């Protein structure tokens, strides 16, 4: 598999380290050269690339997606908070209808998306509570504080890099059905996501506590392995979930 990785932060570097690729291209505006990786000075999708992995930012998703969709590639997107922007969301999916690309949204930092996608037509509402250390939100607080309650769209304007989980859920069931609560807790050194699903099929609750990556406490290693699983599934004859 030949891949193009957009973003050479902690996630991108881990993919290079742990992935099994024939060739790796990378596009990153600030990263230095990495051994074994062909760095692109300008954004493009080389003709031998079969899979594009975005692990940069919601801004990168908005800037490069329409160009990527012109190519017959597998496009894996992590920064799903870009889709909280309704205008971009509508344009993206309009372009996708006639695109030769296939788009994949890994589960990222949470689980339970197999359940959610299976019953999406029966979901009444989803409530997601995210508990984070204040520093990861750019805050300096002394006590546990609810810093936000509301829609995914509203949350994305205040915390654009902390709403990927809620945005992925919104893409599955519809953003209008998702309510977000963000809690900053100084006692926490990791992130907790609690997802509560109410549906005509049943009611479900998932609690995910992620251990931060040693290299970057803001990143969950589960996200890295979620991308690797998606990459393996592209070539596997057996797929679970």
Curated annotation (Swiss-Prot):
Keywords: NAD, NADP, Oxidoreductase, Pyridine nucleotide biosynthesis
GO molecular function term, any single one: oxidoreductase activity, acting on the CH-NH2 group of donors, NAD or NADP as acceptor
Record's keyword annotation contains NAD: yes
Activity regulation annotation text: Competitively inhibited by L-malate and NH(4)(+).
Active site as annotated: 193
Gene coding for it: nadX
Classification via Pfam families: Asp_DH_C (PF01958), NAD_binding_3 (PF03447)
Protein name per Swiss-Prot or TrEMBL: L-aspartate dehydrogenase
Keyword NADP on entry: yes
């Amino acid at each position: 598999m030949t891949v193009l990785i957009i973003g050479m932060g902690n996630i991108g570097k881990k993919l290079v380290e742990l992935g099994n690729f024939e060739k790796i291209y990378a596009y990153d505006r600030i990263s230095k050269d990495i051994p074994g990786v062909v760095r692109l000075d300008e954004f493009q999708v080389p003709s031998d690339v079969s899979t594009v992995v975005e692990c940069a930012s919601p801004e990168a998703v908005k800037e490069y997606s329409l160009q990527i969709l012109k190519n017959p590639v597998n496009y894996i997107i992590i920064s799903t908070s870009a889709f909280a922007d309704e205008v971009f969301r509508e344009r993206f999916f309009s372009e996708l209808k006639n695109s030769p690309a296939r788009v994949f949204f890994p589960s990222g930092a949470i689980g339970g998306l197999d359940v959610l996608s299976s019953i999406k037509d029966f979901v009444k509402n989803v409530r997601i509570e995210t508990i984070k250390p204040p520093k990861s939100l750019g805050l300096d607080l002394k006590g546990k504080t609810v810093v936000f309650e509301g829609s995914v769209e509203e949350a994305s304007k205040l915390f654009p890099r902390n709403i990927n989980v809620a945005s992925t859920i919104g893409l599955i069931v519809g953003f209008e059905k998702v309510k977000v609560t963000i809690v900053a807790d100084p006692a926490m050194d990791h992130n907790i996501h609690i997802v509560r699903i109410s549906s005509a099929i049943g009611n479900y609750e998932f609690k995910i506590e992620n251990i931060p990556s040693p290299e970057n406490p803001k990143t969950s290693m589960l996200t890295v392995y979620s991308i690797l699983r998606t990459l393996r599934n592209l070539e596997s004859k057996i797929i679970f979930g």
